[in-house]
Amino acid sequence: MGKQKADYLLRSDHIFTSTVENPFAGYVAVSGQNILAVGTDDGSDWIDEQTEVLELGDQLVTPGFIDVHTFFTGYAIFHIGIDMSGITSQEEFLQKIKEQVEKEKEPSTVFGHGWNPNGFETEGLEEKLNEAYSDRAVIVFAADRSTCMMNRKAEEAYGFNPKECYPEAYHKIMPEYLNDRDFIEPEFKDYMKLMNSRGVTTVKEMGFDDFYGFDSFLKEKEEKKELSLRTFFMSQPVGEGINIEHGKRMREKFQGDFVRFSGYNRMTDGTVASTKGDLLEPYEGTNMHCSIQVDYPMIEKEVQLADENGFRYSLHAQGDGAVHKVAGIFDKCQKKDGKLVNRHAVTDMEFSNPADLKKMGEIGVTGEIYFQIMSLDPADDVKKSIEETIGTERGKYFWNRRGMLDGGMTLSGATDLPLMI
């Protein structure tokens, strides 16, 4: 029997395997879902009359990227319900709502997206929604999800308001749209297409609590071989505490190549700029270490429970105080030969102490980093914020990616999609 031939042969002047430092000219031979060979010649030994040869020239060929923190559930909010972009008056806004209500056979929450809060004067609009729809919830999200317009019925039903319009606050609406097949089927297909178009083939996906039934959707798509995005999903306790039994069920349910349960995820503190970051030393000119309360004992209990049951835990920590406490929590977890048995991770690490980075490197904590986050705000604004909150001396440890690597940590890249898209 002769050597197996390729279904596809990709030739490029720039092939990056990630196992060598620089790209090189050559080929990649592919059969089915398997890479047969990678080489620096023309790959002709792998070709027969059935092989499709792709001459890619200057185009880069690289392994698929892994995005270690994505949030499809939040991405979908950009497209939920009525498209309210382009609305320029309260009259248009109310007319759109009215038209949607008249279309629906059964009374349900009216959702909308794309609203521009600065597009027209909104004073009195909430009262008009209350009068017109006293028995029906109405929620229209701003184009950037920073706020929303909603009536009293919606606030009562879902337990949040326009001043607290963020995913953890509006988690009660998620079961509705995640189980709306007419909406979620095309939405997830577009999401996979978007990620694939950026070279992403695998994601670590955030799902609140028990994912509100969305795991059944993923299972169905996996069995039908309709997934182009490998999905390792996590449970983030929001409406309830850690649900270990759910994790056990998901671990048993997903054993294939495309979907797996990856463990648990939780926030600790907030950003340093907002003074919600937990600091080892007080904020400049104050006696305050953190403007919010963080329940570290509860977090430690959850991490220990997850660790005992063979699950990993990702903790978000932004201030150096939070990073220090997270390092201490992980240091108490199971180890073998000095390294963590379960691959726990710390996310973001906006501001950190080099000693804690070294400690985490020694025990094998992975860093999940939003590498693009430095591009969100103008450089001068960031510098000013650092000077005002922690000062220039401590500021040299802000976004200390070099220190993380020098400390021995393995770093992975995340977009926190939809934040970075």
Predicted features by range, described:
Residues 272-275, 311-321, 368-371, 404-421:
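Short acidic/histidine-rich active-site segments
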Residues 221-224, 250-256, 339, 360-362:
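Acidic (Asp/Glu)-rich catalytic clusters
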Residues 152, 214-216, 323-331, 377-384, ...:
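Histidine/acidic-residue-rich catalytic or RNA/ligand-binding cores of hydrolases
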Residues 228-262, 343-350, 389-409:
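Phosphate/diphosphate-binding loops
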Residues 78-85, 340-343, 348, 379-393, ...:
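Short beta-alpha connecting loops at secondary-structure transitions
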